[in-house]
Amino acid sequence: LDDRNYDDLEYLYKIEVERSTFLTLEDRTYLEWIKTIIDFYQYELQFEAISHLENILSKVASTTLIYLKVLNTLSNFYSLVGREEDYEANYSHLIELYQTKNLDHQEVLFGYIRVRYNYAHYLVSKEKYNEAMQEALETIELCKERQTSYQLAPLLVLVGNCGTQFLGKEQVKNYYLEARELCKIYNNPLMLMKIENYLKELDAV
């Protein structure tokens, strides 16, 4: 999902559906969740996908990991169709749920980081740069405490972008440079290219 390649995702989804005869409820729910992502982004069936996710949530226990995944995706869909109040309510609910989880489990930790990164990104879209930067900085601190680089480069870039409003040029540059090093280590050429452009723009100021 991270590289947004929905053609490949749909291909894998179809293979799983064809070969899956006896599935647990969680496995079936997982496949339904994947289908809503394909419908939303690949086929622009936004309202159908949202309705499908809302229906899934009504049938799944809120204590499960798949519930968290579905709720996070539904939140993102809400933000993309302009349902901001619903998005913010879901975000608050997600944070409450994650506070009951054990972040020592990688899947839980990554989900929590993803939710907080998405919220920081949402705040940027609302031009709430100070709040977005604060959210991103707290999440960066969490990544470093937990010794994970998951979403760390995008978070650093987000702070750099927001920081042009509040920080000195060298501070902003340091965030970009740290993100650039991570992209080199983990071979992320697309983000690396974006960061190089941000650095050029910064040097031109």
Residue ranges, per PLM feature:
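Structural register within alpha-helical repeat arrays
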Residues: 35-37, 74, 112, 119, ...
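Structural motif corresponding to the intra-repeat A-B loop/turn of tetratricopeptide repeats
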Residues: 3, 42-43, 74, 81, ...
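Residue at a conserved register position within TPR or TPR-like alpha-solenoid repeats
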Residues: 39-40, 78, 116, 123, ...
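Non-membrane alpha-helical segments in proteins
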Residues: 1-2, 27-42, 69-80, 118
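Helix-turn-helix repeat elements of alpha-solenoid scaffolds
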Residues: 2-15, 40-55, 83-97, 127-137, ...
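Short coil/turn linker motifs that delimit alpha-helical repeat modules in TPR/alpha-solenoid proteins
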Residues: 23-26, 45, 62-64, 83, ...
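Residue register of alpha-helical TPR repeats
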Residues: 30, 69, 107-114, 154, ...
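Amphipathic alpha-helical segments of tetratricopeptide repeats
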Residues: 13-20, 51-61, 92-103, 137-148, ...
